[in-house]
């Protein structure tokens, strides 16, 4: 065996330690193994890994301001958004969420026309003045009027002629005792002249006309007698009942809707815009993709002056930065944290949600782009943690799926009530409902599957306990958030975003939950997992 002048064996015979460079200089070992210190990017933390540290406070929870930015231009009084899932958000949920101070995002697992129709239902559900009221003609039948009233959930219609002039009004009172549904509207309606208001009437003047004349509907006409709007007493009542309601400049409820990137995505988006949607959510499982970035950019350039555009979902700083560069008005964060999502075990991909939010915020905050935390939220405290990590709003799925307003099927099991809840990557969602076509496959870039048995699901189907009306659930969730703001001395969400965390151990998590006792009475905001 040959030796060099140093007395060491030839270098070809050396077994080199992974912690020693060839030049003889030692290097620190890589804690996770291997020789690349960047192979494991960082420690990933989620909601159960941290707690918010209490701080000096003069904040009373009841006085805390929970308003926060959903997008660059839209601010919600309650920082909660319902998820675009077919067992969570359709028009009924979207209406209830907006009335509670949040907003609903309509799912896209239905035909384009139906989704656009749901947008119209939300926008028509209440308004300071309906600027394009549903109308009928004198020669329409009572059956046709009844169908229109049922579709839009209204109790009467103005009657106009071919020139748009108001000639009468027909309400439930006119039709209630009519047996012959083939009768024409002209035979039954209350004919002009009617109590009307002129264009530009103030809210107080309109309310005065309604009160003095003891009527529920006040048509608004121009100088030529043509119908230009409709004011109803119900809208004044709803304003009093829901003071936190999220509304546009015309007094209509705000609503969002999900779109994809393949197939009919562009046609769908344009129909939704025409229907009056306020926010378009380009909703995919992986938004750090050229198709998604191009869709966000195209929507911003084509209709960005009419709607806000949200991009998602992402879990890294670079992905969030890419959406910001594409022009997104908000970035939605969450790859695999949802209770019904299996992406992290099927694909092995994702990032724990607290870390994902922190990373996305690092890219979005300098650009003034809000972050939406989507998924993994099980308790009201998780919402507070998500916002403290830098998110501006939280998107909820399982927490709302059990409410009366959710479209999931009501199920009875051993005398207890549940509602169905499934991931949009589940086989059921990608196969459609009741044999109907599925429009959610492209969310997981699976729209090219040749047959349904070739689908690779990234979600499951399940059930959640029935929770009653949405208003009660939102009250508990916002109550928990307000409590967190009190503990941390945060009068606003923006201050809460500066709160500090403490990392906890599994023993700390066990200590955080009720322990060493048998629960005898369930609390409305806590349940054992």
UniProtKB/Swiss-Prot annotation:
Known EC number: 1.1.1.205
Residue numbers binding K(+): 336, 338, 341, 511-513
Residues reported in the UniProt entry to bind IMP: 339, 374-376, 397-398, 421-425, 458
Binding site for NAD(+): 283, 289, 334-336, 343, 458
Source taxon at top rank: Bacteria
Cofactor: K(+)
Record-level Gene Ontology MF annotations: IMP dehydrogenase activity; metal ion binding; nucleotide binding
Class in the EC hierarchy, top level: oxidoreductase
GO BP term (any one): GMP biosynthetic process
Cell wall biogenesis/degradation in keyword set: no
Disruption phenotype: Cells lacking this gene display impaired growth.
Function comment: Catalyzes the conversion of inosine 5'-phosphate (IMP) to xanthosine 5'-phosphate (XMP), the first committed and rate-limiting step in the de novo synthesis of guanine nucleotides, and therefore plays an important role in the regulation of cell growth. Does not catalyze the reverse reaction, i.e. the conversion of XMP to IMP. Appears to be essential for the optimal growth of M.tuberculosis.
Family per record: Belongs to the IMPDH/GMPR family.
Name of this protein: Inosine-5'-monophosphate dehydrogenase
Provenance organism: Mycobacterium tuberculosis (strain ATCC 25618 / H37Rv)
